[in-house]
Amino acid sequence: NYSLSSATLDINEKPLSLSGTKVYDALATAASSALTISGTVGGQDLTLSGNGTLSTGADVGANKTINTTGLSLGDGVSGTPGTASNYSLVGGTHQMSVTQKPVTISGSRFYDSTTNVSSSDINTFNNIVGGQTLAITGSGSVSTAVAGSGKTISLGTLTLTDGTGLASNYSLSSGTFDINSRQVNITGSRIYD
């Protein structure tokens, strides 16, 4: 009683997902250059431009959700180029992990015949971002007690603590230490001759 004369078919955009990792930089930014696109058909290549934002802020964390406003898909330019209009970032899973930023420390004291490095001897924190400050507790050591510069610190119990920045966003990777020569005063006397 019926015959099929025609039909229509809608082809919807395919949702894509984004993933990436960056080292803590005090910014809640998910830069396109740090993100990888997944979910294209047949491994088609697409480009990504702009910046997204991390919904839970800049701090270190795994699989933080990316707000994709500010990110744009573009046609592929290498491999098997894809057409951006066939795809969408709506409906995909978009996550970025933020890892701790390595920090190095340095300090100095005068010779005291020990190899101890106290937290109070540490005066420089290198590689901290955004004008932040950190503090430190605990103690470490150097290999020899003699005076010298650029000695490698065995970190021991040295631990970063919060300053204006959060210590949890950083990792203590290494340090150098100077032991300065101690001034010695000599006195004496003799009988007039």
Features from the language model and the residues they span:
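Short loop/turn motifs that initiate or flank beta-strands
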Residues: 1-192
